[in-house]
């Protein structure tokens, strides 16, 4: 708890207001105690956490099968969380080519139920340094291409998909 508070306080002291707090690779879901701290601090600061609504058993089962220890206690904590919650959370799927990655992304988005979904991605410029720090460099370069691709923009428009951010989500929550 001390570390999480220290990080948020440092950012606020530097003159920034975080739009949300993130679990980074789901680490705060690693134990009920971590999650309790994560959600408590989010509510105290009024900064939304990327918390997932687990009231839909299909969603909870998906994350259990993905290795997250979603005990009844965790589901109950999420139910009591008062700030906005995600209906689903995913990352841009990999592909063996740019076109395949784009098809996989379209398939993922098409499979989603209406609601608030966070899809993480790591857009990157191809550099020698990037190639030395991650084996997923090609996926990241394609992700940068993906979100400037006119076909992706058209797909979003044709399917009524609204791109938003945590500040807008929080504003809608307050209204």
Feature-to-residue mapping (PLM):
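Active-site beta-loop-alpha junctions enriched in small/polar residues
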Residues: 24-26, 54-57, 88-93, 122-126, ...
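Catalytic grooves of carbohydrate-active enzymes
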Residues: 14, 100-133
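Short, glycine/charged-rich beta-strand-loop motifs at protein surfaces that mediate ligand recognition
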Residues: 91-97, 107-108, 139-142
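Conserved, mostly hydrophobic/aromatic
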Residues: 21, 119, 156
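C-terminal domain-boundary segment and adjacent tail
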Residues: 49-50, 133-175
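Catalytic domains of cell-wall/extracellular-matrix polysaccharide-remodeling enzymes
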Residues: 7-84, 96-103, 110
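Glycine-rich anion/phosphate-binding loops
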Residues: 1-5
